[in-house]
Amino acid sequence: ATYKVRLLSEAEGIDVTIDCADDVYILDAAEE
C-alpha cells in the first residue's frame, strides 16, 4: 500500500504532500 502523507508547518511555511510506501519509514521518505 502507498499512503499520501502531508507535512504541514505554518511557522516554517511548509506544506508538502509525499507518497510513502507502507514498508518505508516516514523519515526516510521525507528525506527524498
Curated annotation (Swiss-Prot):
UniProt keyword list: 2Fe-2S, Chloroplast, Electron transport, Iron, Iron-sulfur, Metal-binding, Plastid, Transport
Source organism, top-level taxon: Eukaryota
2Fe-2S ferredoxin-type domain segment(s): 3-32
Main location: plastid
A molecular-function term among this protein's GO annotations: metal ion binding
UniProt keyword Protease present: no
UniProt-annotated location(s): Plastid, Chloroplast
Keyword Cytoplasm: no
Cofactor(s) required for function per UniProt: [2Fe-2S] cluster
Protein family per UniProt: Belongs to the 2Fe2S plant-type ferredoxin family.
Name of the protein this chain belongs to: Ferredoxin
Gene source species: Porphyridium purpureum (Red alga)
